[in-house]
Amino acid sequence: MVDNLAPLEPSLQNLVDQESLKWIFVGGKGGVGKTTCSSSLAVQLAKVRESVLIISTDPAHNISDAFDQKFTKVPTKVNGFNNLFAMEIDPNAGLSELPEEYFDGENEALRVSKGVMQEMINALPGIDEAMSYAEVMKLVKGMNFSVVVFDTAPTGHTLRLIAFPQVVEKGLGKLLRLKMKLAPLLTQFVAMLGMADVNADTLSQKLDDMLRVITQVNEQFKNPDQTTFVCVCIAEFFSLYETERLVQELTKCGIDVHNIIVNQLLFLEKSHNSCSMCASRFKIQEKYLDQIADLYEDFHVTKLPLLEKEVRGPESIKAFSENLMIPFNPKETSNK
């Protein structure tokens, strides 16, 4: 019966057309071109959305290199665009990665310094990273971008990032349930640090606010109308293996995934007198492309070319991004 179904469109047009999407993750094995693909997708989304944010959660922070522009932990407009913004965060860096102003309240009584918050959570292993993520999600959500694209770290870190909303929601929930027992201790602790204007209620309110945002984000991440994941791979064994592992883990987490990008492909004509290495490489890729077609027949599989030059700078990304929408045709390229 499957053979009678028309193959799905080999592009990311379906994602650009899906106006309900709020969160798009792009990930895969290291070195497959995730940043180029996520940046290109963000450029295409900027054509049809009011405002787009691309966030790098990879400590390597390659989007600065991709757009040839330095980005920080504060959303910055990308050169050459009116509605595309970029920021780089390192979830592993914890609360130290966040600017001081993210810890400010509307009045003096609600202000909690980063140092105090850091001291209080240092005794809880892993909570620093989780709190950092929670604050970032709270920040991003408050900015009301039409859609957010995550340029993620290699697979292992990505799976941890995806699971964070659930982890944080459970962790903050436990902390809040203990707040009545901890309140006297917390009050004494901040008093010892000379922070008279900070009390347990202030910290509790911070946690309440965070929990509310994270609960909402957790619900959205599991809603295919609002969240999806794009897997990027190359036509090689280890990359395909990582992709299958990633797809299975995402499915377990309840995250929608129905788009795969196969990057760095050689497009050779049969009559083309190519070098022996190119011909061998082409045969290897053909083998794994056949496996991808069998494994992911119900996915949109987009094939991208291996280029002679690197994709760097806004104009270069704009040009390359067209390959996400229109299947690459080597004949058209050679005629230009």
UniProtKB/Swiss-Prot annotation:
Q: Per the database entry, which stretches of residues form a coiled coil? A: none
Class of this enzyme? hydrolase
Q: What is a biological process (GO) this protein takes part in? A: tail-anchored membrane protein insertion into ER membrane
Q: Name one Pfam family in it.
A: ArsA_ATPase
Where do the annotations place ATP binding? 29-36, 236, 263
- Keywords linked to the UniProt accession: ATP-binding, Cytoplasm, Endoplasmic reticulum, Hydrolase, Metal-binding, Nucleotide-binding, Transport, Zinc
* Primary residence: cytoplasm
Q: Which GO terms describe its cellular component?
A: GET complex
Where found in the cell? Cytoplasm; Endoplasmic reticulum
List, alphabetically, the InterPro entries matched: Anion-transp_ATPase-like_dom, ATPase_ArsA/GET3, ATPase_ArsA/GET3_euk, P-loop_NTPase
* E.C. number(s) listed in UniProt: 3.6.-.-
Q: Name one GO molecular function term.
A: ATP hydrolysis activity
For the ligand (Zn(2+)), the binding residues are 275, 278
Superkingdom of origin: Eukaryota
Please name the catalytic residues of this protein.
58
Q: Which family does it belong to?
A: Belongs to the arsA ATPase family.
Q: What does this protein do?
A: ATPase required for the post-translational delivery of tail-anchored (TA) proteins to the endoplasmic reticulum. Recognizes and selectively binds the transmembrane domain of TA proteins in the cytosol. This complex then targets to the endoplasmic reticulum by membrane-bound receptors, where the tail-anchored protein is released for insertion. This process is regulated by ATP binding and hydrolysis. ATP binding drives the homodimer towards the closed dimer state, facilitating recognition of newly synthesized TA membrane proteins. ATP hydrolysis is required for insertion.
Q: How does it assemble?
A: Homodimer.
The molecule here is called ATPase ASNA1 homolog
The taxonomic lineage of its organism, from the top, reads: Eukaryota, Metazoa, Ecdysozoa, Arthropoda, Hexapoda
